[in-house]
Swiss-Prot record:
This is Adenylate kinase. It is an enzyme of class 2 (transferase). Catalyzes the reversible transfer of the terminal phosphate group between ATP and AMP. Plays an important role in cellular energy homeostasis and in adenine nucleotide metabolism. Zn(2+) binds at C130, C133, C150, D153. It is found in: Cytoplasm. GO terms for molecular function: adenylate kinase activity; ATP binding; zinc ion binding.
Length: 217
């Protein structure tokens, strides 16, 4: 079962990824994890990636794709994998198809967790931090007992600059524009399924699970 998991920030992608890999016993492969593992193993591509990361530069596609190739060829991917954070562009998706073809595989499912923009803004801008102790709250998911005050020490709660609703909205707009060509690519290949991410976490997983189960039978 070879899966690409997509979704905008705040859609709950990480939560659902954890549930899928636990249920289906496949590796959860994120770009960051791949880079860290390649660097730790001291591979040639890992060292190349590190040199770019140390400079604060983006790792070029050819290095990233090489690391993906090495990762997907490992034995734990034999029965499938879940890719998270890769591919990000159509050229990367085309390179992924080429890698998988060499391995006698293909992407079977691209799962896109959809949440309305207003809901994403509410989720992402609801975080509040205590000025005194740094404790984190969320107005929707983990609100303080008393509005504006930390439960632990009564410290004032504040909103970080990058959690400001306008900043969040702008960030989402950029992400949406970047994601659309990739969604179109997988739609054209007939492997894209949009999942309603505004439901309860367990209901979202039930929908994902039903889809994956039906494709196995």
């Amino acid at each position: 079962m070879n899966i690409v998991l997509m979704g905008l920030p705040g859609a709950g992608k990480g939560t659902q990824a954890d549930k899928i890999v636990e249920k289906y016993a496949i590796p959860h492969i994120s770009t960051g994890d791949m880079f860290r593992a390649a660097i730790k193993e001291g591979t040639e591509l890992g060292l190349q990636a590190k040199s770019f990361m140390d400079q604060g530069a983006l790792v070029p596609d050819e290095v990233t794709i090489g690391i993906v190739r090495e990762r997907l060829a490992k034995p734990d991917c034999e029965k499938g994998f879940l890719l998270d954070g890769f591919p990000r562009t159509v050229p990367q998706a085309e390179a992924l198809d080429s890698i998988l073809a060499d391995l006698g595989k293909a992407i079977e499912h691209t799962l896109n967790i959809q949440v309305e923009k207003d809901e994403l803004i509410a989720r992402l801008s609801g975080r509040r931090i205590c000025k005194t102790c740094g404790a984190s709250y969320h107005l929707i998911f983990n609100p303080p007992a008393e509005e504006g005050k930390c439960d632990k020490d009564g410290g004032e709660l504040y909103t970080r600059a990058d959690d400001n609703p306008d900043t969040v909205a702008n960030r989402l707009e950029v992400n949406m524009k970047q994601a659309q060509p990739l969604l179109d690519f997988y739609q054209a290949k007939g492997v894209l399924t949009n999942i309603d991410g505004q439901q309860d976490i367990n209901k979202v997983f039930a929908d994902l699970d039903a889809l994956l189960q039906s494709s196995r039978s």
